Amino acid sequence: MKQATFSEVTEKVRETVFRSPLADRLSGISVDENDDELGGEFLRVVLEVKGLNTFKLDQMTPLVQSIEDAVAEIDERFASVRLAEAA
């Protein structure tokens, strides 16, 4: 299984996010390595959004897909992208 280092994955996610026209709506990004219930590994990507009520969720779909595609180029683990309202 092709796996990039944690820092490579994090950098790839950051590059993808900051190229997005929605970058100004985000206040943070976190990437964590996780295990599923079946013993498989995946990457949890959390995008901290400045205000979940300031846009429609479908506006984030292209960014989520871009992150999933970018991670897939360097790592075979699935990138599970989630949104969270920034504190």
Please give the residue ranges for each predicted region.
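N-proximal, solvent-exposed amphipathic alpha-helical segments enriched in charged/polar residues
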Residues: 1-32, 61
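Short, charged/polar micro-motifs that form catalytic or ligand-binding hotspots
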Residues: 3, 53, 57, 84
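Short edge beta-strands and adjacent turn/loop segments
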Residues: 23-48
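Residues that cap or initiate secondary-structure elements
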Residues: 35-37, 51-53, 87
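A short interface-forming secondary-structure element
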Residues: 44-62
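Low-complexity, intrinsically disordered Gly/Pro/Thr-rich segments
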Residues: 63-69
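A short amphipathic beta-strand at an alpha->beta junction
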Residues: 69-87
